[in-house]
Swiss-Prot record:
The keyword Oxidoreductase applies. GO terms for biological process: L-arginine biosynthetic process. Pathway: Amino-acid biosynthesis; L-arginine biosynthesis; N(2)-acetyl-L-ornithine from L-glutamate: step 3/4. This is N-acetyl-gamma-glutamyl-phosphate reductase. The gene is argC. It catalyses: N-acetyl-L-glutamate 5-semialdehyde + phosphate + NADP(+) = N-acetyl-L-glutamyl 5-phosphate + NADPH + H(+). The keyword Cell cycle does not apply. Catalyzes the NADPH-dependent reduction of N-acetyl-5-glutamyl phosphate to yield N-acetyl-L-glutamate 5-semialdehyde. The active site is at 149. GO terms for cellular component: cytoplasm. HAMAP family: ArgC_type1. Its EC number is 1.2.1.38. It holds the Pfam family Semialdhyde_dh. Belongs to the NAGSA dehydrogenase family. Type 1 subfamily.
């Protein structure tokens, strides 16, 4: 099946290229860029030399439609909203890595993203692409809104608790830490090496755009869920996310019950690995893979559950989950083309 990538020179784009070039069923028909049209991808990123030869093309929907069946949009917020209706109109399936179609309510999108929302008709058509929790909807979708990286790690950690109804709806606290690639390719003072090396920075306190995305998904499983407390930090690693989730249970529980809850929730999910009781993962243990590893603890003294969730923000948090969703759309096994062992060193 032929695919196209728009926004091929960003970090999400080059991770899509790396994965798709090794995929046994998908092949790259074309790569598209806004700023580097006419350049060979190997001139922009020499690590692709002798692996693929593609010239970066301008975005011509009619030409893309002739060559591809699925389009991956690795474009900034706002750009996808403009392009997607045109791509859908010619019968292409779209997997969007931006936040433009994650929110069903355009007012909420505009409130958090500070820009105009996509057309409501297209928003209604979009399916939120959290693969493990939306499989049946993704199978039939023409437009998939790939989840945000923080949202992916957080939702995979909290949804078993929310679905089971065992936690207080107003008790969810999420502490999230990300490597610098999550901030994208465009440099800023905060991501500048001297600013972040040997340092730790909190940002977007109570204002991160993944907050409404998480709350929207939680409300699908429990309408009583209240607003969450969510903080995000940059740490001096290139890729990886660690989310530490806290929630208060409604009644006394045993850690064995919580462990069983998670093991049963994800027993059919090849990319979710639940650690043994008392063990907790680190981002290094999933780097370069599509895995989400989790460890669970319970504090009898406070009645709080702690869940630690780690992913590679470029893989399960972006390109890896996008291809997992493409596999579902194409009727393939979810794991095809994504069976990479983590790169520990």
């Amino acid at each position: 099946m032929k695919v196209a990538i728009i926004g091929a020179t960003g970090y999400g784009g080059i991770e899509l290229i790396r994965l798709l070039e090794q995929h046994p069923y998908f092949s790259i028909a074309s790569l598209h860029s806004f700023s580097q049209v006419g350049e060979c991808i190997t001139n922009v990123y020499p690590h692709f030399q002798n692996v693929l030869v593609h010239t970066l093309q301008e975005i011509d929907v009619e030409e893309i439609e002739k060559e591809a069946e699925i389009v991956f949009l690795a474009t900034p917020a706002g750009v996808s909203a403009e392009l997607t209706p045109k791509l859908l109109a010619v019968g292409l399936k779209v997997i969007d890595l931006s936040g433009d179609f994650r929110m069903k309510d355009p007012f909420i999108y505009e409130q958090w993203y500070k820009r105009a929302a996509a057309k409501e008709g297209v928003l209604r058509e979009a399916v939120y692409g959290l693969s493990e929790w939306k499989r049946s909807e993704i199978q039939k979708a023409n437009l998939i809104a790939n989840p945000g990286c923080f949202a992916t790690a957080a939702l995979l950690a909290i949804l078993p608790l929310v679905r089971s109804g065992i936690i207080e709806e107003d008790s969810i606290i999420i502490d999230a830490k990300s490597g610098v690639s999550g901030a994208g390719k465009t440099p800023t003072t905060m991501t500048h090496f001297p600013e972040l090396y040997d340092n730790l920075r909190i940002y977007k306190v109570n204002e991160h755009q993944h907050i409404p995305e998480i709350e929207q998904m939680l409300a699908e499983w429990n309408r009583e869920t209240k607003p969450i407390t969510f903080s995000t930090h940059l740490i001096p690693i290139s890729r990886g996310i660690m989310v530490t989730l806290y929630a208060k249970v409604k009644r006394e529980m045993e850690i064995e019950q919580l462990q069983q809850l998670y093991e049963e929730a994800y027993e059919q999910s090849a990319f979710i690995r639940i650690r043994m009781q008392g063990e907790f993962p680190s981002p290094k243990e999933v780097r370069g893979s599509n895995y989400c590893d989790m460890g669970i603890a319970y504090d009898e003294r406070t009645g709080r559950v702690t869940v630690v969730s780690v992913i590679d923000n470029m893989m399960k948090g972006a390109a890896g989950q996008a291809i997992q969703n493409a596999n579902i759309v194409a009727g393939l096994e979810e794991t095809i083309g994504l069976q990479h062992m983590p790169l520990y060193l």
